[in-house]
Amino acid sequence: RKNVEWNGHHFSSLVLDGGHNADALEALALQLEDWQFTNTTVILGMSGDKLQPVLIPMLEKIFRSCALLIACPFDSQRSVKPKELLRFLHVEIGSEKLPKTRTVRGAEEALGLAAESKENPLVVCGSFYLAGEVMQLLSD
């Protein structure tokens, strides 16, 4: 979606993607490349059982256009803690290849942080749960 308003904030472009496996993340990476997004803010939340090295090449492609990566939990016991998610990414990808990173306590805080970079496209990905929470916040 383009020109999304939330809580007095404006996002120029917003992509909600529930993909959480290699094929889905590859499709997202290709789509972001096709749209020529730059300086993207990515809100990423994942289930602990999905933290697999096989996802790294796809995540690296997504992060190429990323200026800020926000690690965000979602309301499920399966959600990986944000610091654990970033630790996994730092080990598997390397700190030098990651964009600027932040952790938050939930989707509302993540949207607030993303709103500070309002001209940047926003991509929410990694979990249907997280995408659903963001959709709910945007519809309130």
Please report, for each region that a protein language model flagged, where it lies by residue:
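Nucleotide phosphate-binding/pyrophosphate-handling subdomain across enzymes
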Residues: 1-68
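Active-site-adjacent beta-strand anchor residues
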Residues: 18, 45, 104, 124-125
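Short active-site-adjacent structural elements
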Residues: 24, 51-52, 78-80, 111-113, ...
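Short amphipathic alpha-helical segments
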Residues: 27-29, 55-57, 82-84, 135-138
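A glycine-rich beta-strand to alpha-helix segment
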Residues: 110-139
